[in-house]
Every structure is written in C-alpha cells, then in structure tokens.
Amino acid sequence: MKIYLSGAMASCMDTYQQIFANKQYELEYAGHIVVNPAALPVGLDSDRYMPICLSMLDAADAIYLFNDWEHSNGALLEKAYAEYQGKEVLYG
C-alpha cells in the first residue's frame, strides 16, 4: 500500500523530519511505499507546500495521521482531501 504521512510540522520544526523518517522506515519495513512530505526542501513559502503535498497525496492509497494532526491546518486539509477521494485513513 502507498501511504502518505501527515501531521503537524510547523509546531515541531526541530524534530518533524526525524519523526517522519522513523515512521517511513517502520512502514517500509512492513512492506509499504511511503510518500513523505517531510522530505520536501525547507524554506519555501508556506502557501507553496500545500499544492505539492496534495499532489503527493494523490499518489497514495491511504493517509497516515500522526497523533498531533488535529493541531495542523495542513493535516486537517489533507485528511479532508483524502476522505473526499475515498482513501483509507490510518491514525497513529
């Protein structure tokens, strides 16, 4: 299964890349393909990330939401978009 990772990034700028990378490793070890938006380059304007992230989400079968997802406007939008598309929603 292709799984897109989603969660609050801005609130944990120092650690989100490692947190996402750890989950990516865990899911890949279980045989999944992981679509990881934390691999995008740092430094773009915030309004530039979401169109890229939604395109990445298009390539996935499911979305994985980290525990903090409800505190992120981006993750809220990604969840709604995934549900609209009928993708499976997985919770951390």
State what each model feature region is.
Residues 1-92:
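Conserved catalytic or regulatory cores that recognize and/or transform ribose-phosphate-containing ligands
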